[in-house]
Design a protein with these regions (language model features):
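Short functional linear segments
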Residues: 1-46, 53-66, 71, 107-116
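ATP-dependent carboxylate-amine ligase catalytic core
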Residues: 29, 34-36, 63-157
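Aromatic/hydrophobic pocket-lining residues that form π-stacking "cages" and hydrophobic walls in ligand
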Residues: 57, 128, 209
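Nucleotide phosphate-binding/pyrophosphate-handling subdomain across enzymes
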Residues: 135, 140-143, 152-156, 160-163, ...
Length: 420
């Protein structure tokens, strides 16, 4: 089997859709020797901010000299990004080796049990657990939940800590229709007295979190109550009890990144007793270099991409544009997948600049004829970039929406730059 054949096999499981539940995962992992039981790992859940928080933690612990695994989704350029070691994506050789071990087990699942076929995400999660727990053991892993928490495929290990940067309305068909219902699903990963670090401004979400923490014997750490972050992404001060980190500068702009980084700092301090090389000075140095591709990322001096893929993340993007780029004329290009609340997202975006919509090559991308007619349209992002993006720094060009869309934009723009 070649690497491409392995990749095609993984993606071929996409047809089995999304199936919440852990029975298939538990069976496959048992057949592989339960590698997840060997893991020392932190679980990151939430609606937005998971990837940035994972990236901050990865940068801190890698810079401290530990062997660090990360599991994130979706990928921005290359599928192998989803399983990374010390900030570098898994090699083709290692992924091929994992698939050769896992594929026979996956194929036995529907034949030897009453379970249906495994989904694509379940298989990728099994590959990750096998890699970090058995094939290439790590000192610590930072694992991002795929969707929700309680019934998510990742929820089969005992976490050192659980982090939740935000709760918003997304994937309601699966997770619930209210913030409280979604919060209950997310915090469902909390177990075994692991500390729970979170940020929220909603009483209903806080109540759900605190109730679950009491049930699990977990201590909670809430941003703004137990630890604070005062300032902006250019410079903020972090305080927890008598511990203070002053003048922290982030590589990523935006007030939401201050919150994400603060959760990562809090977790790092709590884990310090088992990972003593993580010092306050190292944390500050690491955060100054922790970039996350596809999130408020500048591909050119005046061209930003940002994967604002739901109402909450669109609001965060708008706050950033209004606070950091108020002196610019803003032009926006947007594309999404058809499970997102595009009317609300578009209504927000049109308030900050000249808005155009497009479609992209993805199975459930929103087609042009499905957008409200009031918005300008272009057939594809390449056309928009060629027609709109100039070297005039009076304007800021922002491409946003689905992370799948952003990944295609990023790849193409960087390829054009390399051809010059």
């Amino acid at each position: 089997m070649t690497y491409q054949e392995a990749l095609d096999w993984i993606h071929g499981q996409l047809k089995f859709g999304i199936k919440p539940g852990l029975e298939r995962m538990a069976w496959m992992l048992k057949e592989l020797g339960n590698p997840q039981n060997n893991l020392k790992a932190v679980h990151i859940v939430g609606t937005n901010g998971k990837g940035s928080t994972v990236n901050a933690l990865q940068t801190i612990f890698t810079q401290a000299g530990y062997e660090v695994g990360t599991f994130t989704s979706p990928y921005i350029i290359d599928f192998k990004e989803r399983i990374s070691l010390n900030g570098q994506m898994i090699s083709e050789e290692d992924l091929l080796d994992l698939v050769s071990r896992v594929k026979p087990v996956v194929e036995r699942l529907p034949k030897e049990t009453e379970h249906e076929n495994a989904t694509e995400f379940e298989i990728i999660t099994v590959l990750m657990f096998l890699y970090f727990g058995q094939v290439h053991p790590v000192d610590i892993a930072f694992i991002e939940a795929g969707m929700g928490g309680l019934h998510d495929s990742t929820n089969l290990f005992k976490p050192l800590a659980v982090l939740c940067p935000s709760i918003g309305l997304d994937h309601q068909a699966i997770l619930g229709n209210t913030h409280a219902e979604i919060a209950a699903e997310k915090v469902g990963v909390l177990k075994n007295g692991a500390p729970f670090i979170y940020a929220t401004d909603r009483t209903d979400v806080r109540d759900v979190f605190e109730k679950k923490a009491r049930e699990e014997g977990s201590k909670t750490y809430e941003l703004g109550r137990d630890f604070t972050a005062e300032g902006s992404s250019h410079s903020f001060d972090f305080t927890y009890g008598d511990q203070k980190l002053d003048d922290i500068a982030l590589a990523m702009a935006g007030q939401h990144q201050v919150a994400n980084a603060s959760l990562a700092i809090m977790a790092s301090l709590l884990l310090q007793k088992d990972y003593p090389k993580v010092t306050p000075k190292l944390i500050k140095d690491a955060l100054a270099h922790a970039n996350w591709r596809g999130r408020t990322e500048f591909l050119r001096p005046n061209l930003m991409i940002d994967g604002a893929h739901n109402n909450e993340s669109v609001k965060v993007l708008i706050d950033l544009l209004q606070s950091e780029h108020a002196d610019k004329e803003i032009e926006l290009l947007f594309a999404a997948i058809d499970t997102k609340p595009i009317d609300g997202m578009l209504a927000q975006l049109k308030s900050v600049g000249d808005l155009t919509v497009t479609s992209f090559d993805y199975p459930n991308s929103v087609k042009l004829d499905k957008y409200p007619e009031v918005y300008k349209q272009v057939p594809d992002f390449k056309t928009w970039i060629k027609e709109h993006v100039t070297t005039d720094n009076k304007n800021l060009y922002v491409i946003t929406g689905s992370l799948y869309f952003i990944s295609q934009v990023r790849k193409w723009v960087l390829e054009q730059a390399s051809d010059v």
